[in-house]
Amino acid sequence: MDVDKELGMESVKAGASGKPEMRLGTQEETSEGDANESSLLVLSSNVPLLALEFLEIAQAKEKAFLPMVSHTFHMRTEESDASQEGDDLPKSSANTSHPKQDDSPKSSEETIQPKEGDIPKAPEETIQSKKEDLPKSSEKAIQPKESNIPKSSAKPIQPKLGNIPKASVKPSQPKEGDIPKAPEETIQSKKEDLPKSSEEAIQPKEGDIPKSSAKPIQPKLGNIAKTSVKPSQPKESDIPKSPEETIQPKEGDIPKSSAKPIQPKLGNIPKASVKPSQPKEGDISKSPEEAIQPKEGDLPKSLEEAIQPKEGDIPKSPEEAIQPKEGDIPKSLEEAIQPKEGDIPKSPEETIQPKKGDIPKSPEEAIQPKEGDIPKSPKQAIQPKEGDIPKSLEEAIPPKEIDIPKSPEETIQPKEDDSPKSLEEATPSKEGDILKPEEETMEFPEGDKVKVILSKEDFEASLKEAGERLVAVDFSATWCGPCRTIRPFFHALSVKHEDVVFLEVDADNCEEVVRECAIMCVPTFQFYKKEEKVDELCGALKEKLEAVIAELK
């Protein structure tokens, strides 16, 4: 140890003349017949600076690390041909790529070294990965121990355990033999592989270390080197984003292009020339206009269509957004049509995704239906559910148990008995009877003797005045269709039976009388004699009404 230290001191004082020879000889002795002479020459030319810095470090720390540094230094520079676990070591003039499990992608500007101890060597790059890797460059000599991060002017990159260094273009290392390659893209998919663009370096996992052409990075378990352009390190489904788009999924990378993004299930890795998109089970990558990623094999569509239906339902219309549930009702500009299970309306400008939260988004419409969602088109907003009621600009025909068409000119509301009412016309019919509007209901036969009751006192006075004669009281309402139907007949009976007193009570105007007489429905007819009720009839029953009057009088 003392001899080595003295040699170091003498070589530094005398200049850089003696040390290179000593270093070269030492390297030749430890190389054991290494044929890679170019790397030795490059390293030997850098020895003076390296020795100087190592000497300074040794003196600062009481000369304790110099032997270890020189030993590790020589050992690492000579291990290029001895890779662990039988990994192939391809070599090029500008870069060296070492992928895992026989994958060996090579580019003219890339250096990839992911695994324990792979040591590719190039004239401009030295990559050493292990706990105490010592990268060497022409300007810097850094002696890191366990997670130190040396930096050189060229590229020293040292990843450990699956670290994936990236060059200025794109390296791709897929697992299990999948090696897709595009002219501008290389996508790495292994459960957490990260696609890289020309301006991004993204490495997710416990110690991923992205790399640029101007920075050397030497991380261990979580060290995060950052490049001059964009370094992104997402962990487990983090989604880095590049100037165009870079998306990294877990389990089933799904890249998407600017025209059509297609996502296959679990492991399919389609490649586009512009965009790499990789979502995780439902991640939604977005392209300049549309990027849609459905779950479990859903297929996102082109710039104008992103349709993800459930059970094959693919509704599409030219200007509509339709989301059917077992009977959803897609609507057109003039008609409302209700398709059930399997109806496939299709539109070029809509995006329809009915299922579990899939959220496709397009520049014109983003529609997300889930079991009874409410799709809304530029001109219509329709909500159908079992017995949906579609409404169009000109027609609205909602069918449920009773058809209730509604238009600006006609409105029909049936309750037990049909009671349609409109702004201009009220035409309720029951059993063929034709009702008359209020203007006509006032036209009763000549000699009409029906008295209208306005208050409780008036009602009591009328009963007292009648004495022993039969009093027939009609409890009705103006909004009641059957009441309007039988009212003319009631007035006709008043002419026919002159010995009977006919009274008419408006249920809305005389609520006190209605409560006292316990009226439950309209029309109701009550019959009094001597101020006491003798009979009651509910409903617009003409024949029965006439029979009761004839019997009681």
Curated annotation (Swiss-Prot):
Domain of life: Eukaryota
Biased composition (Basic and acidic residues): 99-143, 173-209, 233-254, 278-376, 385-439
Expression sites (tissue/organ): Testis-specific. Only expressed during spermiogenesis, prominently in round and elongating spermatids.
Residues with Phosphoserine modification: S362, S392
Annotated keywords: Cytoplasm, Developmental protein, Differentiation, Disulfide bond, Phosphoprotein, Redox-active center, Repeat, Spermatogenesis
Subcellular location: Cytoplasm
Region (22 X 15 AA approximate tandem repeat of Q-P-K-X-G-D-I-P-K-S-[PS]-E-[KE]-X-I): 113-442
Free-text function comment from the UniProt entry: Probably plays a regulatory role in sperm development. May participate in regulation of fibrous sheath (FS) assembly by supporting the formation of disulfide bonds during sperm tail morphogenesis. May also be required to rectify incorrect disulfide pairing and generate suitable pairs between the FS constituents. Can reduce disulfide bonds in vitro in the presence of NADP and thioredoxin reductase.
One of the record's GO cellular component terms: cytoplasm
Residue ranges constituting the Thioredoxin domain according to the UniProt record: 429-553
Phylogenetic classification of the source organism: Eukaryota, Metazoa, Chordata, Craniata, Vertebrata
Any one GO BP annotation for this protein: spermatogenesis
Protein name: Thioredoxin domain-containing protein 2
Gene Ontology terms, MF aspect: thioredoxin-disulfide reductase (NADPH) activity
Primary residence: cytoplasm
Disulfide bonds: C480-C483
